A protein has these predicted regions:
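Short acidic, glycine/serine/threonine-rich loops at helix termini
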Residues: 2-6, 50-53, 78-85, 113-116, ...
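Helix C-cap/helix->beta junction micro-motif
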Residues: 7, 63-64, 192
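Active-site pre-lysine segment of PLP-dependent enzymes
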Residues: 25-27, 51-63, 75-101
Length: 196
C-alpha cells in the first residue's frame, strides 16, 4: 500500500477465503480490467502465515498478460529453502512462467540487520523501470536504482556478511528448525482447551 500511495496507484484488495485465508482466485479474475497493472500474491502473508495459490495467480497473469509479483517479504528466506529442508512446497517463484518479480526482506529470516530488502526480477525488462535518472543535474547525470538516493553501505555489507556466514546450509538448517518447532507448538496448542 505504501508504494501505491507514493505512486498514486489505486489498489484493489481481493477478498480471501474465510477458512484458508488464501486469495480468492475467482474474485481476483473478476476484478481484472483494462486498468489492472499487476497481480500480487503473498508467500506467505504476514497475519496468518498462509501462502496464496501462486500457481493460480501466475496462470491469471499469463492469461491476461499481466506481471505477477510474489510478496515473500516475510518468508522468502524460509520458503526458498523448504524443499532442501525436507518440506516440499508447490512452486512459488520463477519456475512459474507468470511470476515476474519476488520480494524478500533480509532482516526477517535472512537474519541480517534491519534496513535492506531484495526485489528480484525475472528479466531486466522490469528492473529497468526501477531506476531513476536525471540528466540535467548541474553535477552531471544523477542516477539511482532505488527511491532512496544516497545510502550508507554498512547494512548491505552486514547483510552480505550474514549470508556468507550462514551459507545455504545455514539457511536450510534454520528452516528445518523453524518448521519443526512450529509443528511442535501447533501440536501442543491442540491439547490446550479453548485454543485452536
Amino acid at each position: 500500500d505504501k508504494a501505491a500511495d507514493l505512486l498514486g496507484i489505486r489498489i484493489s484488495h481481493v477478498p480471501v477465503d474465510e477458512v484458508t485465508r488464501r486469495v480468492d482466485l475467482r474474485a481476483m479474475s473478476r476484478m481484472i480490467n483494462n486498468k489492472t497493472i499487476m497481480l500480487v500474491g503473498s508467500a506467505p502473508q504476514f497475519p496468518h502465515g498462509t501462502m496464496d495459490n501462486i500457481q493460480g495467480i501466475s496462470d491469471l497473469g499469463l492469461k491476461y498478460n499481466l506481471p505477477v509479483h510474489v510478496d515473500a517479504c516475510l518468508g522468502g528466506f524460509l520458503i526458498a529453502f523448504m524443499d532442501d529442508a525436507g518440506f516440499p512446497l508447490k512452486p512459488f517463484d520463477f519456475r512459474l512462467a507468470g511470476v515476474t518479480s519476488i520480494s524478500a526482506d533480509t532482516h526477517k529470516y535472512g537474519y541480517a540487520p534491519k534496513g535492506s530488502s531484495l526485489v528480484l526480477y525475472r528479466s531486466s525488462f522490469y528492473r529497468n523501470y526501477q531506476y531513476f535518472c536525471y540528466p540535467d543535474w548541474p553535477g552531471g547525470i544523477y542516477g539511482t536504482p532505488t527511491i532512496t538516493g544516497s545510502r550508507a553501505g554498512g547494512i548491505i555489507a552486514a547483510c552480505w556478511g550474514v549470508m556468507k556466514l550462514l551459507g545455504r546450509e545455514g539457511y536450510v538448517t534454520a528452516t528445518r528448525d523453524i518448521i519443526n518447532t512450529t509443528r511442535r507448538i501447533t501440536e501442543a496448542v491442540q491439547d490446550v482447551p479453548g485454543l485452536k
